[in-house]
C-alpha cells in the first residue's frame, strides 16, 4: 500500500511540475499580451461604463468603404491528465495558436471574400493526441464569390448564391457547422444557395466537396508542416434545408436531408465507401427571460458503407442509424439571467460486426463542443454509440461575463461497440454499459468588448464500469482536462 501511495505521489509531483511550467509560461504570455493590448488602446473599462468602440484593423488602416478587413488570433493552453485513449501518453498538453485573416470586397450586390487560417500546436510529443483537428498551418479557409438578389419569391426576400471554398453553418450545426472551439475549421468547395423570406423563413440548397486537411501524418503535424488542403470528387456532400418560423408553440421548425458519397482514391486513400442519406427535423424555441425554451431534433441515417477501409473489403453493409436530441430549459427573469436545462442525447451504436448491417451513427461534419464538452486533445464524448442525459446551469452576470456548469451521465447504446469517441471497445460485450459521468464548467470574460476575450474551462470524466473493465481501456484513471485562452478580434 505504501509503495502504491509513494508511486502515486511521485506521479502527482511530475504532473504538477509539468503543469506548473506550462501554466507559468502561458500566464506570463497572457500578462504580456494583455499589457501590450492596454498600451495599444485595448484598456478594459468597468462593467458599468459606456460601451467602448471595438478595435478594428480596417478602421486603423482607413480602408475604402468597399473593402472590409478583419481577423482573430487565439492563444490556448490545454492540459489533459489521465489519458483515456489507448496507446497514447498518460498526460498530454498543447499550446494551440489559431489566426484568422479575412478580406471582403463589396461592389453593389457582389462580394468577393477571402479568409486565411493558420492553426499550430506546440509542446506536443510523439504520443500526443494531436491531429488535423488541432493543426492546419497556413491555409486558404475561404475564397468565394457571393451574389445577392432581392425580392426573389416574395417581396422583402433575399437570395444569396455563393460559389467557391466556404464554411457552412446549417441549422443546429450538429451535422454541418463551422467549428468554433476546435483549433481548425472545416471548409467546403462548391455552390450554396440561401433564400430568406420576409417572415424569416429559410431555404438552403448546396452541393459541395468537403476539404481534406493536409498534411495528416503524425510527423508533419508535430512539426506544424504546411501543405495545401485538397478537395476532389471522391468525397461529395449535398443537402436541402428548410426552416419555418412560428411552427410549434411559438418555436421554429427545421426540415432537412443531407447526402454524402465517398469513393476510394487508388493513389491517395482507402475509405469505407460511404453512401449515406441523413433526413431529419428539428423544433426549436430560443431561450428568453421568464419563459420556457426547447430544442428537439430527430435524425435518421441510411444507405451503405463498408466495415473497414481495407482494399480487400468490397462488401457493402446496409446502414440504418439514428440520432436524437432533447433539450428543455427555463430562464429566470432575475439578475444574472440563470438558465437551467435538461439535456438528452441518443446516438445509435453498432449492434453486431457479424451481420450485413451498420448501425453506428455518423455525425458527418458537425461540431460537438456545445453539448459534449471541449475537443482538441480531449473530446471523449460524441454522437456515436451513446445514451447521455444531463443538466446544465448557465448564467450571464453582466454584458461582459458568462459561464456554465454541466453534468452528463453516459451509457453505451451497444455494449459490443466502442464508446462514443473514446476509442475503447469490447467486442465480447462483457465490460458493462456505463461509460461514466462528465462534469464540465466554463467562464468567459470580455476584457474589452468585442476585442479581447478571456476564457477558461475544465472537464472531469469519472470513469464507469465500461472504461474500467474493457480490455483495451487505458487504465490511467479519471481523465481531467482544463484549458485557458485569450482571443483577440480585430
Predicted regions span which residues?
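N-terminal periplasmic/intermembrane-space "pro-region" immediately following the signal or transit peptide
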Residues: 2-5, 26-29, 33-92, 98-108, ...
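Structural signature of outer-membrane beta-barrel domains
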Residues: 76-80, 112-115, 119-123, 166-170, ...
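Signature for the C-terminal beta-barrel architecture of outer-membrane proteins
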Residues: 148-161, 178-354, 396-399, 407-411, ...
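Flexible internal linker/loop segments at domain or repeat junctions
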Residues: 359-383, 414-429
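Surface-exposed loop and membrane-interface regions of Gram-negative outer-membrane beta-barrel proteins
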Residues: 83-97, 107-161, 174-177, 223-227, ...
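Outer-membrane beta-barrel signature, preferentially recognizing the C-terminal barrel domain
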Residues: 233-239, 369-392, 396
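Predominantly the C-terminal beta-signal and adjacent terminal strand-loop region
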Residues: 447-489
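N-terminal secretory signal peptides that target proteins for export/translocation
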Residues: 1-21
Amino acid at each position: 500500500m505504501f509503495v502504491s501511495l509513494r508511486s502515486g505521489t511521485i506521479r502527482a509531483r511530475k504532473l504538477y511540475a509539468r503543469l506548473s511550467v506550462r501554466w507559468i509560461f502561458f500566464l506570463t504570455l497572457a500578462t504580456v499580451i494583455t499589457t501590450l493590448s492596454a498600451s495599444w488602446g485595448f484598456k478594459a473599462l468597468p462593467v458599468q461604463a459606456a460601451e467602448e468602440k471595438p478595435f478594428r484593423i480596417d478602421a486603423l488602416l482607413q480602408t475604402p468603404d468597399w473593402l472590409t478587413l478583419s481577423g482573430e488570433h487565439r492563444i490556448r493552453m490545454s492540459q489533459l491528465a489521465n489519458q483515456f485513449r489507448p496507446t497514447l501518453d498518460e498526460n498530454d498538453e498543447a499550446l494551440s495558436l489559431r489566426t484568422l485573416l479575412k478580406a471582403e470586397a463589396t461592389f453593389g450586390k457582389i462580394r468577393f471574400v477571402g479568409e486565411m487560417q493558420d492553426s499550430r500546436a506546440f509542446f506536443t510529443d510523439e504520443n500526443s493526441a494531436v491531429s488535423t483537428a488541432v493543426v492546419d498551418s497556413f491555409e486558404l479557409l475561404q475564397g468565394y464569390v457571393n451574389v445577392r438578389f432581392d425580392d426573389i419569391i416574395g417581396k422583402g426576400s433575399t437570395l444569396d448564391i455563393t460559389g467557391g471554398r466556404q464554411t457552412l453553418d446549417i441549422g443546429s450545426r450538429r451535422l454541418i457547422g463551422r467549428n468554433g472551439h476546435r483549433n481548425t475549421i472545416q471548409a467546403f468547395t462548391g455552390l450554396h444557395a440561401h433564400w430568406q423570406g420576409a417572415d424569416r423563413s429559410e431555404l438552403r440548397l448546396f452541393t459541395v466537396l468537403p476539404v481534406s486537411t493536409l498534411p495528416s501524418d503524425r510527423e508533419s503535424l508535430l512539426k506544424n508542416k504546411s501543405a495545401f488542403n485538397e478537395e476532389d470528387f471522391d468525397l461529395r456532400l449535398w443537402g436541402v434545408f428548410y426552416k419555418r418560423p412560428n411552427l410549434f408553440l411559438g418555436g421554429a421548425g427545421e426540415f432537412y436531408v443531407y447526402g454524402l458519397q465517398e469513393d476510394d482514391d487508388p493513389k491517395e486513400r482507402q475509405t469505407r465507401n460511404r453512401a449515406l442519406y441523413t433526413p431529419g427535423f428539428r423544433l426549436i424555441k430560443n431561450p428568453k427571460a421568464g419563459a420556457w425554451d426547447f430544442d428537439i431534433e430527430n435524425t435518421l441515417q441510411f444507405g451503405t458503407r463498408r466495415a473497414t477501409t481495407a482494399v480487400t473489403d468490397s462488401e457493402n453493409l446496409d446502414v440504418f442509424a439514428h440520432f436524437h436530441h432533447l433539450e428543455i430549459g427555463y430562464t429566470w427573469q432575475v439578475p444574472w439571467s440563470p438558465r437551467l436545462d435538461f439535456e438528452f442525447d441518443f446516438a445509435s451504436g453498432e449492434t453486431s460486426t457479424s451481420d450485413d448491417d451498420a448501425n453506428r451513427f455518423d455525425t458527418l461534419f458537425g461540431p460537438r463542443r456545445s453539448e459534449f464538452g471541449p475537443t482538441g486533445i480531449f473530446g471523449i464524448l460524441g454522437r456515436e454509440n451513446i445514451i447521455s442525459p444531463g443538466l446544465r446551469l448557465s448564467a450571464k452576470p453582466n454584458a461582459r461575463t458568462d459561464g456554465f456548469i454541466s453534468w452528463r451521465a453516459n451509457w453505451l447504446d451497444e455494449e459490443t461497440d466502442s464508446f462514443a469517441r473514446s476509442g475503447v471497445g469490447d467486442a465480447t460485450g462483457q465490460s458493462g454499459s456505463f461509460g461514466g459521468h462528465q462534469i464540465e464548467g466554463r467562464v468567459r470574460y470580455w476584457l474589452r468588448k468585442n476585442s479581447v476575450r478571456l476564457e477558461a474551462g475544465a472537464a472531469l470524466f469519472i470513469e464507469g464500469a465500461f472504461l474500467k473493465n474493457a480490455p483495451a481501456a487505458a487504465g490511467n484513471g479519471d481523465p481531467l482536462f482544463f484549458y485557458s485562452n485569450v482571443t483577440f478580434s480585430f
